[in-house]
Amino acid sequence: MASPAPLVASISHQMVALQTLQLLQQEWGWGDGPVAPGNPRDPDHVSTAPARRSGPPRARPGPGREERGGGVGTRSRRTAARANSPEEEVVRGAEGGAELLPFPRDRGPCTLAQMAMRSALARVVDSTSELVSVEQTLLGPLQQERSFPIHLKDSVEFRNICSHLALQIEGQQFDRDLNAAHQCLKTIVKKLIQSLANFPSDAHMVACASLRQILQNLPDI
């Protein structure tokens, strides 16, 4: 039985990249945060809810310190004020990923360039999610039966590109990083198709068809 270790490691790097991009979408108000692989979100959906923040639990009032005048509402308003403060606008990325920079939200309607950037980012996120799903459900069992080449360095590069992308704010460098992530993801998919091409079994053909569908969703930008 062939070892699935290279594929597992490759998926791990892709998952970190995916979570980093999903958190980037969430921080910019372009998505709902991390979702399970294989469940792409609507790229046109824009979340207006603030990102959830974690913090230490508040102590309950002790005897003689009972809050008055609608204490729950008061606490909620104070919590909302903290969540919307500028100091809370930096969000940690996925474990091992990058720290996301704050994105200025109150900028009015999106320009055409911003809409195109949002669409391109959503396409990379959804395609990465689909790729991880195909690798886990189809390629994993095939790799255990018969080994085929896995190019781990491409997934490592993809993760690094996405981590660098998360450090950028709009501009030419962001566009270059997004295009690099797009092209690197296409390279990963193409090499997987090539690795499976020499195995004519039905299961390999199904996996190749799924990978080709991902390629169709990644046109050149």
Swiss-Prot record:
Stretches for region Disordered: 31-92
Tissue: Ubiquitous.
PANTHER family reported for this sequence: LEUKEMIA-ASSOCIATED PROTEIN 7 (PTHR36961:SF1)
Protein name: Leukemia-associated protein 7
